[in-house]
Amino acid sequence: MPNENIGFIGLGLMGSAMVSRLQDLDYQVTVCANKSRPNIEAAIARGAHEVETACALAQTSDIILLCMDTSASVEARMRGPDGVIAGLQKGAIVIDFGTSLPASTRALGQEVAAAGGYYLDAPLGRTPQHALIGQLNI
């Protein structure tokens, strides 16, 4: 089993496929609660651990993966007392797989760096089916 603690926020079509692939490779994944339950429940059924807030996820994750639809969604999960930045461990890596706005990405990168972490912008290419077999373009 790999040693990194992976936190994942955003289990839509692409995110849930990415989590499934990580679980296929024996990564321990922590997922953040969401109102939409089917993909969260599927990840939990395969061994994922669920936490209520992005802050709690960050407190136990070496690598935090974000797969959300808009910059506003990313910012909402990153900032505030329940956000990733509030719980970020020193040296943690945050990777945003969305197509976020450049100004938002730069601002979050600075905030994560100030908290002792690293922020990577890594938009995805291809489909959820490619994610399931580990063939995304990142």
Please name every model-derived segment.
Residues 6, 99-138:
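Rossmann-fold dinucleotide-binding core
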Residues 21-24, 45-46, 78-82, 108-112, ...:
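Short, glycine/charged-enriched secondary-structure capping and boundary segments
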Residues 7-15, 47, 80-83, 87, ...:
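Glycine-centered flexibility sites
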Residues 30, 51, 94-95, 120, ...:
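Structural detector of well-ordered beta-strand residues that form the stable sheet scaffold
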Residues 54-66, 70-118:
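Rossmann-fold NAD(P) dinucleotide-binding segment
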Residues 37, 73, 127:
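Active-site loop signature of alpha/beta-hydrolase-fold enzymes
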Residues 1-66, 131:
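NAD(P)+-binding Rossmann beta1-loop-alpha1 motif at the extreme N-terminus of oxidoreductases
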